[in-house]
Regions:
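N-terminal small-domain helix-loop-helix segment of the aminotransferase-like
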Residues: 6-96, 103, 154
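Short beta->alpha connector loops at strand-helix junctions that form conserved
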Residues: 119, 138-143
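Active-site phosphate-binding strand-loop segment of PLP-dependent enzymes
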Residues: 141-187
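Structural signature of beta-strand start/N-cap positions in the alpha/beta core
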Residues: 114, 135, 164-165
Length: 187
C-alpha cells in the first residue's frame, strides 16, 4: 500500500521507536522506569461497571452526530459550577484528548502556518501539526531553567505573520513544568 506524502512526513513517535528496546531489556530482567506512555492510575468507578452490567438495549445505535445531550449538559453544568460558563454549542465530546487536539489543530492551521510549542513537547504534536501542513516553531527550554518558557521576550521572538497558535499544557508534558498565575496570564 502506498501511504500519503503527509503521513510519510510524520514518522514514528519516539516512544514507539524505543518500546521494542525497553521490552527486550525487561525480558532480560533489567529494571525499567517507565516515563513514556501514561496509563490511568485512578480506579474506574463502580457505577460504570454497574451500568454496563445492567445495560440491556438490544440495538447499539450510533450516538447523535451533535453529541449525547446528557453528556453535553453535564459538561456545561460542570463549567458553570467553576465560574466558566459555556453553552452546549461550545462543547465537542471526543474519545480522547489527542483526538480533540488533532481536530482543533485541523480547524485552525493551514499549509504554511506556524504554531509555537515549548520543547521538549509531547511527541505526537509533531504528527498532528504535520498533517495540517503547518510547522512547529519551538521555544527551546533547558533543565537548568526548569523548562520555563513563559518569558515575554522568548515568546514574542517566536511570533510572526505565520503564527496561528501557541500550544502548551499546564503542567507541561513531558517536563512537568507548572506555570505560575503570572506566566499563565502572559500566555
Amino acid at each position: 500500500m502506498k501511504f500519503s506524502s503527509k503521513i510519510e512526513k510524520c514518522g514514528l513517535s519516539p516512544m514507539r521507536k524505543f518500546a521494542p528496546y525497553a521490552n527486550e531489556a525487561a525480558k532480560k530482567g533489567k529494571k525499567l522506569y517507565h516515563l513514556n506512555i501514561g496509563q490511568p492510575d485512578i480506579a474506574t468507578p463502580a457505577a460504570y461497571f454497574e451500568a454496563v452490567k445492567n445495560f440491556s438495549q438490544p440495538v447499539l445505535a450510533y450516538a447523535p452526530s451533535d453529541g449525547v445531550p446528557e453528556m453535553i449538559d453535564a459538561v456545561v453544568n460542570y463549567y458553570g459550577k467553576i465560574d466558566a460558563p459555556i453553552t452546549n454549542k461550545q462543547v465537542l465530546i471526543t474519545t480522547g484528548g489527542s483526538e480533540a487536539l488533532q481536530i482543533a489543530l485541523s480547524c485552525i492551521l493551514d499549509e504554511g502556518d506556524e504554531i509555537i510549542i515549548p520543547e521538549p513537547f509531547y511527541p505526537n504534536y509533531s504528527t498532528f501539526v504535520t498533517l495540517t501542513g503547518a510547522t512547529i516553531r519551538p521555544i527551546t527550554t533547558t533543565p537548568e531553567e526548569n523548562y520555563k518558557f513563559a518569558i515575554r521576550e522568548r515568546v514574542e521572538a517566536c511570533i510572526n505573520e505565520h503564527t496561528r497558535a501557541i500550544l502548551f499544557t499546564n503542567p507541561g508534558n513531558p517536563t512537568g513544568t507548572i506555570l505560575t498565575e503570572e506566566e499563565l496570564r502572559l500566555m
